[in-house]
Amino acid sequence: MALASVLQRPMPVNQHGFFGLGGRADLLDLGPGSPGDGLSLAAPSWGVPEEPRIEMLHGTTTLAFKFQHGVIVAADSRATAGPYIASQTVKKVIEINPYLLGTMAGGAADCSFWERLLARQCRIYELRNKERISVAAASKLLANMVYQYKGMGLSMGTMICGWDKRGPGLYYVDSEGNRISGTAFSVGSGSVYAFGVMDRGYSYDLQVEEAYDLARRAIYQATYRDAYSGGAVNLYHVREDGWIRVSSDNVADLHDKYTSSIP
């Protein structure tokens, strides 16, 4: 009954023709000690619940932006469950292939599953077409997959970042099937603080070290103001020859660095 209460669909009991038994549950022998009505164990048909019964607790800060030397991707590493810190070492940048990265914001299971599935589909595309999938095609593929489950409780807000024949690419995709191309995005509970830093310091003409520092500072500022973000700042750089992991800096060390520079 726990599953039925979540899905809010009645369990099929002794329906005519169910499992081809013509409503005769006595023909289904589950052995000694089994419930009298074995058909009550069957899962209900798929349906959309009227209202979610499981509260999704999440918080994070991720960002990505394009500049003249590629795409910068950064994220914190804290995982929370309501007021509790579940982990300080979560990897929120998912490596799809050597030229594509995805970020994780929302439900960790949803993001991890769908982006791993995307990685599989991208590999199949490469084997069939003998060429690397474009960033636009990869993001569209993900948007199409999750759109089929719109309204069913998925929680995912991701950025697909990469480099293809057209140059650096950056797309935002969420669990509602939305897909947006842009030059800079930040997703998560701390994104408002990260955007404040990015809006002030972002320029397409940034040098590499300037871009690194901007991303670190934006994530640090979000962790300083948002209780659901923290841990370490994981920084990646997507270049023409593929992505590299630049650094992983503890936010406590960044706090000492940035506060000591204030007069």
Swiss-Prot record:
Protein family membership: Belongs to the peptidase T1B family.
A GO molecular-function annotation: peptidase activity
Broad enzyme group: hydrolase
InterPro entries the UniProt entry points to: Ntn_hydrolases_N, Pept_T1A_subB, Proteasome_bsu_CS, Proteasome_sua/b, Proteasome_suB-type
Pfam family, one: Proteasome
Reactions the enzyme catalyzes: Cleavage of peptide bonds with very broad specificity
GO cellular component: cytoplasm; cytosol; nucleus; proteasome complex; proteasome core complex; proteasome core complex, beta-subunit complex
Subcellular location: Cytoplasm; Nucleus
Active-site feature positions: 60
Enzyme Commission no: 3.4.25.1
Gene Ontology biological-process annotations: proteasome-mediated ubiquitin-dependent protein catabolic process; proteolysis; response to oxidative stress
Binding site residues for bortezomib: 108
Superkingdom of the source species: Eukaryota
Gene3D superfamilies the UniProt entry points to: Glutamine Phosphoribosylpyrophosphate, subunit 1, domain 1
Official protein name in the record: Proteasome subunit beta type-5
Lineage of the organism: Eukaryota, Metazoa, Chordata, Craniata, Vertebrata
Propeptide: 1-59
Induction note: Down-regulated by theophylline (THP) and up-regulated by 1,3-dinitrobenzene (DNB), two reprotoxic agents thought to induce infertility.
Name of the gene: Psmb5
Annotated CDD domains: proteasome_beta_type_5
Subunit structure: The 26S proteasome consists of a 20S proteasome core and two 19S regulatory subunits. The 20S proteasome core is a barrel-shaped complex made of 28 subunits that are arranged in four stacked rings. The two outer rings are each formed by seven alpha subunits, and the two inner rings are formed by seven beta subunits. The proteolytic activity is exerted by three beta-subunits PSMB5, PSMB6 and PSMB7. Directly interacts with POMP. Interacts with ABCB1 and TAP1.
Record keywords: Cytoplasm, Hydrolase, Nucleus, Protease, Proteasome, Threonine protease, Zymogen
Function of the protein: Component of the 20S core proteasome complex involved in the proteolytic degradation of most intracellular proteins. This complex plays numerous essential roles within the cell by associating with different regulatory particles. Associated with two 19S regulatory particles, forms the 26S proteasome and thus participates in the ATP-dependent degradation of ubiquitinated proteins.
